[in-house]
């Protein structure tokens, strides 16, 4: 069998899907350059840090069911960047609190949720603070343009996008009708996230809670997770439908509404220092979900959690599977 030719590949987006894809492509002998609009890799596997506090403000934990991803999680645990999290979990629904009957095995990054992403990224070529805003395919090569730096000098054999569906759509709509159609189905919703830092311990009978039919969908004590230090902080996620409906609210108004709901649930943040983050694209998945997309003729691919059922595991697998197919 003929060995695949080593390629020079551009990968836009350095969240878990992009990092997983890049790591696998590098293992297969390809040269990969990642372009990430944020200051650092991780995407929604992110952790905010203050002088004396930390808070996971994106993905709160993850699970592992697929054998390939279980192997990756085992490696992360061996490298001490992931640990089991066994919280006391409650559920609030119809004005009542009950214990959660979930049997899920939950994992978190240590000392923050971004730790596994940083581990994946450590040997990769990542251009941070680079928003790719234009693409051109000419003479079998991909040409990229960055909003911050202008034309990218490297000409790429292959272009892979590991970004939310709506962002991918803006780049591929004039290039590939099939990719455009998939990106249009991404159905992604935003998420308002509030972080509250307290001087003193908060007395609540749980570490985290699923909240149903309220503005808020999740509250979590960050210090309940392993290897967290500093002052007590809680992460509060608004539910996806409310977040999407009010995605253009001012941060002040979103904070006010979320704090009112938190107080009703028993988490009074009147004495807390609070900040809020708007995730414009936080959740959602294409239906049907093809796991990844690759146009072999155009040398254009898509990966991400939104192509593979959501979740951290879905993102990692999407990137890994795309890399294997690029190589085939």
Q: PLM features: residue spans?
A:
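Glycine-rich FAD pyrophosphate-binding loop
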Residues: 26-50
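Flavin (FAD/FMN) cofactor-binding core of flavoprotein oxidoreductases
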Residues: 262-298
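N-terminal FAD cofactor-binding segment of flavoenzymes
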Residues: 47-89
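N-terminal Rossmann-like FAD-binding beta1-loop-alpha1 element of flavoenzymes
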Residues: 7-34, 323, 327
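Active-site substrate-recognition segment that forms the wall
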Residues: 195-246, 253, 257-266
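Central helical "cap/lid" subdomain
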Residues: 42, 51, 152-206, 268-269
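Short beta-strand to alpha-helix junction loop
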Residues: 61-67, 97-119, 248-254
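A conserved short coil-to-beta-strand element within the FAD-binding core of flavoproteins
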Residues: 128-143
């Amino acid at each position: 069998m003929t060995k695949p030719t080593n390629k020079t590949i551009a990968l836009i987006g350095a969240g878990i899907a992009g990092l997983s894809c890049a790591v696998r492509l590098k293992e297969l002998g390809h040269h990969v350059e990642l372009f990430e609009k944020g200051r650092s890799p991780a995407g929604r596997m992110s952790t905010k840090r203050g002088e004396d506090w930390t808070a996971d403000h994106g993905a709160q934990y993850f699970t592992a069911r697929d054998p390939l991803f279980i192997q990756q999680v085992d490696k992360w645990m061996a490298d001490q960047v992931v640990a089991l999290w066994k919280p006391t979990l409650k559920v609030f629904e119809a004005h009542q609190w009950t214990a959660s009957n979930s049997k899920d095995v939950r994992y978190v990054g240590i000392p923050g949720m971004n730790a596994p992403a940083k581990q994946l990224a450590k040997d990769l070529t990542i251009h941070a603070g680079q928003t790719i805003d234009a693409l051109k395919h000419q003479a079998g090569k991909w040409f990229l343009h960055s909003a911050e730096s202008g034309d990218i000098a490297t000409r790429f054999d292959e272009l892979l996008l590991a970004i939310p569906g709506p962002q991918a759509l803006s780049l591929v709509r004039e290039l590939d009708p099939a990719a455009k159609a998939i990106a249009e189905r991404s159905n992604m919703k935003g998420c308002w996230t509030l972080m509250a830092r307290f001087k003193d311990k908060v007395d609540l009978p749980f570490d985290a809670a699923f909240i149903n039919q309220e503005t808020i969908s999740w509250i979590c004590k960050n210090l309940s997770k392993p290897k967290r230090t500093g002052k007590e902080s809680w992460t509060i996620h608004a539910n996806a439908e409310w977040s999407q409906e009010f995605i253009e609210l001012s941060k002040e108004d979103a904070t006010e509404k979320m704090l009112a709901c938190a107080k009703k649930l028993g988490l009074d943040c009147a004495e807390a220092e609070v900040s809020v983050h708007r995730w414009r694209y936080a959740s959602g998945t294409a239906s049907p979900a093809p796991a990844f997309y690759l146009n072999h003729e155009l040398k254009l691919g898509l990966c991400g959690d939104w192509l593979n059922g959501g979740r951290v595991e879905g993102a990692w697998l999407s990137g890994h599977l795309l890399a294997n197919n690029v190589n085939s």
